[in-house]
Amino acid sequence: MAIAAVAISAAFGAEDAPPDHVKWMKDLGSQMGALRKGVDVEKNANDMQATMKDVTEFWKKRNSEVGLKTSNDTTAGAAALAKAAQGGDKEAMMSASKMIGGGCKGCHDAHREKISDTVYKIK
């Protein structure tokens, strides 16, 4: 019975992502894809920082500690990656990439509910 109550609560707590949020996530997905391939690393890391400013504001307005912390972690990782790429420091680039991935994962684990292979809601 308790499990059903939690499931129902979670289902009603999820909401469609606003169009701006969907755009930011698609932009971040493209940026991450390019970073994984090593394409224009400094540029994509800088673009990611700009996108993350909007994401951070989104979570700040929602008073989400997890959303805010993970957004800040991702932004810091993107800044570190841009700096490392500029200097050609591959070890620092790997470390920064892990920071970005950890920030994304932390937020997705807390706030993303998978509805289908292509549809997610915010919880």
What are these language model-derived features?
Residues I3-E15:
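Sec/Tat signal peptide C-region and signal peptidase I cleavage site
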Residues K105-E113:
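Detector for the c-type heme attachment site
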Residues F12-G101, E113-K123:
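Extracytoplasmic c-type cytochrome modules immediately beyond a signal peptide or single-pass transmembrane anchor
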